[in-house]
UniProtKB/Swiss-Prot annotation:
Keywords: Carbohydrate metabolism, Glucose metabolism, Hydrolase. This is 6-phosphogluconolactonase. HAMAP family: 6P_gluconolactonase. It comes from the Bacteria. It catalyses: 6-phospho-D-glucono-1,5-lactone + H2O = 6-phospho-D-gluconate + H(+). Coiled coil: none annotated. The gene is pgl. The lineage of its organism: Bacteria, Pseudomonadati, Pseudomonadota, Gammaproteobacteria, Enterobacterales. One of its GO terms (cellular component) is cytosol. Pathway: Carbohydrate degradation; pentose phosphate pathway; D-ribulose 5-phosphate from D-glucose 6-phosphate (oxidative stage): step 2/3. It is an enzyme of class 3 (hydrolase). Catalyzes the hydrolysis of 6-phosphogluconolactone to 6-phosphogluconate.
Length: 331
């Protein structure tokens, strides 16, 4: 299995393309100059395309991924109804979802043969919309509205339209600020990192009564931390054993172990990392974590090791200015 790491640096309008080897070392493959401030990125389910959100002209760009080395070639673009904050796809590669914090909306763009061709739906009224996350069954879109302390729930129709579910939302505690999410591989639990109080909520997707329930909230900061809380990103290993979340003020990554059924998180440790870590990701083997420092203009690679999933730095690499997003492709 080959793995490619993509990093987005909006201040220098670049995507860096890296080859990741089995020892956790990166080799630079390509630097792509992007027509705009590149921020969120996602790889298509079939691994053939990289979708990128850019501003100030709000668009999603599609790049073809070379199967031999992961290099990018521009394919097409499609307009968006707001500044892209987060981008994702459904599991079948039919739709792109874009959350816009500034516009307070989530949009659905239809894909045809892997390329964005048509804006299908836009849902407004999501103040501080920070991500759009499709459930493993491809039926429900979870959309955190950070400024409203809620996660809106939508049913995705076959033609790409979003309809409010019943219930239409779940709520966090006041002032939490839900931001990014991941799902457990067993499809029973979701985890949401809350930006404003730097906590992680564990959501049971369906309890014995058929209801969505928050079963745990865990502080992700050290006990002696007293500065402003500013959490950013969250990811889980493919085997569901380890979960990680980062805070930008403290410039650290919190390491969690996950119970076998996915219902309970335990803090295992704290890893100092690049200055102001805005985004990170985990490789497809669950062996390496790659973090981007928005203020250090570097990325760092960590090995995930042991029963606790603690991190050991393997190397750091200069990228563009203000790196914000990391994605990993395997093929």
């Amino acid at each position: 299995m080959k793995q490619t790491v993509y990093t987005a640096s909006p201040e220098s309008q670049q995507i860096h393309v890296w080859s990741l080897n089995h020892e956790g070392m990166l080799t630079l493959v390509q630097v792509v100059d992007v027509p705009g401030q590149v921020q969120p990125m996602v790889v298509s389910p079939d691994k053939r395309y990289l979708y990128v959100g850019v501003r100030p002209e709000f668009r999603v760009l599609a790049y073809r991924i070379a199967p031999d080395d992961g290099a990018l070639t521009f394919a097409t673009e499609s307009a968006l109804p707001g500044s892209p904050t987060h981008i994702s796809t459904d599991h079948h590669g039919r739709f792109v979802f874009v959350g816009s914090y500034n516009a307070g909306n989530v949009s659905v763009t239809r894909l045809q043969d892997g390329l964005p061709v048509e804006l299908v739906d836009v849902v407004e009224g999501l103040d501080g919309c920070h991500s759009a996350n499709i459930t493993p069954d491809n039926r429900t879109l979870w959309v955190p509205a950070l400024k409203q302390d809620r996660i809106a729930l939508f049913t995705l129709s076959d033609d790409g339209y979003l309809a409010a579910q019943e219930p239409a939302e779940v709520n966090t505690v006041e002032g939490a600020g839900p931001r990014h999410m991941v799902f457990h591989p067993n499809q029973q639990y979701a985890y949401c990192v809350n930006e404003l109080n730097s906590s992680v909520d564990v959501w049971q997707l369906k309890n014995p009564h058929g209801e969505i329930e928050c079963v745990q909230t865990l502080d992700m900061m050290p006990a002696d931390f007293s500065d402003t809380r500013w959490a950013a990103d969250i990811h889980i290993t493919p085997d569901g054993r380890h979960l990680y979340a980062c805070d930008r003020t403290a410039s650290l990554i919190t390491v969690f172990s996950v119970s076998e059924d996915g219902s309970v998180l335990s803090v295992e440790g704290f890893q100092p990392t690049e200055t102001q870590p805005r985004g990170f990701n985990i490789d497809h083997h669950g062996k390496y974590l790659i973090a981007a420092g928005q203020k250090s203009h570097h990325i760092a690679v960590y090995e995930i090791a042991g029963a606790q999933g603690l991190l050991t730095e393997k190397g750091r690499y200069a990228v563009g200015q203000g790196p914000m997003w990391v994605v990993v492709n395997a093929y």
